[in-house]
């Protein structure tokens, strides 16, 4: 199962990229932070709760399909601000978030990743907007995605694997590896992405294993190591 902070529109490119690399994957193999957020919101709030979503139309549609009430624009009855990865971000959306947060609305974010990797380097992700809104309002959200354990727990629930049978592989200590640690499962920190070895000490999160890349992970599994 691939744990992605992106909405369905975002993980389709990931699906295509894996296919290009010869990795067989299907859309159902991806579990997003939006999936975990929907589960959390359904369990915490009443069915008639109105949400103001600062996110893409794809995210809003996913919430609507799950039966949640999403406001089209800023409304007085919006009880919860949900912040997600938003490639359609506008100043009007930020202002609406500030208005609701200053009024005391509940505040939830799908994930805390500061940047999103792109072909030209890094671009702001949900975590960067979290910091911007914190500067403006002093508020911090309840974060649902990694590093919280919900996504890993949901993946195990859907696949039927136990914690002893599960390992989380990722390139970010502060989200991926922390999620696995918080869920009580083994982790593999790969150094072929954003993270570097110094991040282990920086964030105080210890992975079970460290490997250079996914190829080393596959070679290790083929050899039957590590024990």
Over which residues does each language-model region extend?
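Conserved phosphate-coupling serine/threonine residues in phosphotransfer and NTP-handling enzymes
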Residues: 4-6
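Asp-based, Mg2+/Mn2+-dependent phosphohydrolase catalytic module
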Residues: 8-31, 38-227
